[in-house]
Swiss-Prot record:
<feature type="active site" description="Proton donor/acceptor">
    <location>
        <position position="157"/>
    </location>
</feature>
<feature type="active site" description="Proton donor">
    <location>
        <position position="161"/>
    </location>
</feature>
<dbReference type="GO" id="GO:0008839">
    <property type="term" value="F:4-hydroxy-tetrahydrodipicolinate reductase"/>
</dbReference>
<keyword id="KW-0220">Diaminopimelate biosynthesis</keyword>
<dbReference type="GO" id="GO:0019877">
    <property type="term" value="P:diaminopimelate biosynthetic process"/>
</dbReference>
<comment type="function">
    <text>Catalyzes the conversion of 4-hydroxy-tetrahydrodipicolinate (HTPA) to tetrahydrodipicolinate.</text>
</comment>
<comment type="pathway">
    <text>Amino-acid biosynthesis; L-lysine biosynthesis via DAP pathway; (S)-tetrahydrodipicolinate from L-aspartate: step 4/4.</text>
</comment>
<dbReference type="InterPro" id="IPR000846">
    <property type="entry name" value="DapB_N"/>
</dbReference>
<dbReference type="GO" id="GO:0051287">
    <property type="term" value="F:NAD binding"/>
</dbReference>
<feature type="binding site">
    <location>
        <begin position="124"/>
        <end position="127"/>
    </location>
    <ligand>
        <name>NAD(+)</name>
    </ligand>
</feature>
<keyword id="KW-0457">Lysine biosynthesis</keyword>
<dbReference type="InterPro" id="IPR022664">
    <property type="entry name" value="DapB_N_CS"/>
</dbReference>
<feature type="binding site">
    <location>
        <begin position="167"/>
        <end position="168"/>
    </location>
    <ligand>
        <name>(S)-2,3,4,5-tetrahydrodipicolinate</name>
    </ligand>
</feature>
<keyword id="KW-0560">Oxidoreductase</keyword>
<dbReference type="Pfam" id="PF01113">
    <property type="entry name" value="DapB_N"/>
</dbReference>
<comment type="similarity">
    <text>Belongs to the DapB family.</text>
</comment>
<dbReference type="InterPro" id="IPR023940">
    <property type="entry name" value="DHDPR_bac"/>
</dbReference>
Length: 273
């Protein structure tokens, strides 16, 4: 698409929503809509004022249905139940979506997959370029080490995050498990307590830390005899996630209807490991 995409932001009043508004403006794209819950006191507020960048002439709406006609693509970092409703509306309107909502159930993910047969959808647990490059490195490490190491995933986030492990940690685990030919649901171990017995090398361990204002940190350890390789990504602010999501939004407009991920956006699926 040659013209600047018209982008709508859902959950505009949240931390991520405000950062997304800033990212759209920084990228030089058109902020076409900003949406909050209909009962929110922020409805009617200028979206730019809300995001701390001055007036942009776009008022926060309380209805996605009312603004879809003005948008080429919607960015959704809200909550699973809300995202499910947004998917239905965007599917009916033929509007592309970029979804960063985490904690979705298997049923909700199936609904997303179905919607993606009608509209183009980018779905990723993390839109940071650095995280997605890290995942490519994890695939390489898993391929080289194979079954010769123990694998642990450690993640840390702020005290307000409500799901655990993080979607990014699970995305990393999935990438490793797929590379090794394992089913993550069968081999994942979430935390340990009491007499656990010897570690099964086929398992992939997950540990979660919650506290303070940690934006997001992920470390994957490949632990062998006499050496350990660690791949770590640390986010210091939310702008890297927002900038990646806006990049995905510009990329997905005009694409064929299917589900994409951030590796598609970055061309990483074409990089062989």
């Amino acid at each position: 698409m040659s013209a600047a995409p018209r982008i709508g932001i859902l959950g505009a009043g949240g931390r991520m929503g405000r950062t997304l508004i800033q990212a759209v403006q920084q990228a030089g794209y058109q902020l076409a809509a900003a949406v909050e819950r209909p009962e929110s006191s922020l409805v009617g507020t200028d979206a730019g004022e809300l995001a701390g960048i001055g007036s942009v002439g776009v008022k926060v709406s309380g209805s996605l249905a009312d603004v879809l006609k003005d948008c080429d693509v919607i960015i959704d970092f809200t909550a699973p139940a809300a995202t499910a409703q947004h998917l239905k509306l965007c599917r009916e309107a033929g509007v592309a979506m970029v979804i960063g909502t985490t904690g979705m159930s298997d049923e909700q993910k199936a609904e997303l997959d179905e919607a993606a047969t009608h509209i183009p959808v980018v779905y990723a647990a993390n839109y940071s370029v650095g995280v997605n490059v890290s995942i490519k490195l994890l695939e390489l490490a898993a391929k080289v080490f194979g079954d010769t190491v123990d694998i642990e995933v450690i993640e840390a986030h702020h005290r307000h995050k409500v799901d655990a492990p993080s979607g990014t940690a699970l995305m990393m685990g999935e990438a490793i498990a797929d590379t090794l030919g394992r089913n993550l649901k069968e081999v994942a171990v979430y935390g340990r307590e009491g007499h656990t017995g010897p570690r099964d090398r086929q398992t992939i361990g997950f540990e979660t830390i919650r506290g303070g204002d940690i934006v997001g940190e992920h470390t994957v350890m490949f632990i062998g005899e006499g050496e350990r390789v660690e791949v770590t990504h640390k986010a210091t602010n939310r702008m890297n996630f927002a900038a990646g999501a806006v990049r995905a939004a510009a990329w997905v407009v005009g694409r064929e209807a299917r589900k994409y991920d951030m590796k598609d956006v970055l061309g990483l699926n074409d990089v062989q490991v």
